[in-house]
A protein has these predicted regions:
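Acidic, metal-coordinating helix/loop segments flanking the phosphotransfer/catalytic sites
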Residues: 34-52
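Acidic catalytic/metal-coordinating carboxylates
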Residues: 36-37, 63-67
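Non-catalytic signal-transmission and effector/linker regions of two-component phosphorelay proteins
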Residues: 1-7, 114-127
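Receiver (REC) domain active-site loop signature in two-component systems and cognate sites
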Residues: 59
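Short amphipathic alpha-helix used as the core "switch/output" element in two-component signaling
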Residues: 43, 65-78, 97
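Alpha4 helix (beta4-alpha4-beta5 surface) of REC/receiver domains from two-component response regulators
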Residues: 66, 87-109, 116, 120
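Two-component/phosphorelay signaling modules centered on CheY-like receiver
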Residues: 15-33
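Active-site residues of response regulator receiver
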Residues: 12, 56, 84
Length: 127
């Protein structure tokens, strides 16, 4: 598959989920950095390096909403695709976090996600 010259950061504490997302996207030419620990991902994050971040919402140490806030403070232009087994509103209520509207640079997909859903969402966000 041809390289699409887009770099994506994936943070999901479920190793198998992160690995699967990485393999799917790499097969379509994306350059992927994947982490299971949100603290390590935050330490390694560099502004203006990523075209998209894919963040699980339910993670230990730092949930996806908190991680998003910290990444966004370092790179205001970052686009984020939240992914969770919970609905977006349930995840928000569970973590008592700031509710981010799902629009433009912020989108949400509920697990389990199909390859087609994932690719459609990713391509629409990295244009």
């Amino acid at each position: 598959m041809a390289q699409v010259n887009k770099r994506i950061l994936i943070v999901d504490d479920e190793k198998d989920v992160g690995r699967t997302l990485k393999l799917i996207l790499e097969n379509y030419g994306f350059d992927i950095d994947s982490f299971t620990d949100p603290v390590v991902a935050l330490e390694k994050f560099k502004p203006n390096l990523y075209d998209l971040t894919i963040l699980d919402i339910r993670m230990p140490k730092i949930n996806g909403f908190e991680l998003y806030q910290q990444l966004k403070s370092r790179d205001p232009k970052i686009k984020t695709l939240f992914i969770s087994a919970l609905s977006y509103l349930t995840a928000y209520k569970t973590h008592n976090s700031k509710l981010y509207p799902i629009e433009g640079e912020r989108q949400f997909i509920k697990k389990p996600v199909t390859n087609k859903e994932l690719l459609e969402q990713v391509y629409s966000m990295v244009r």
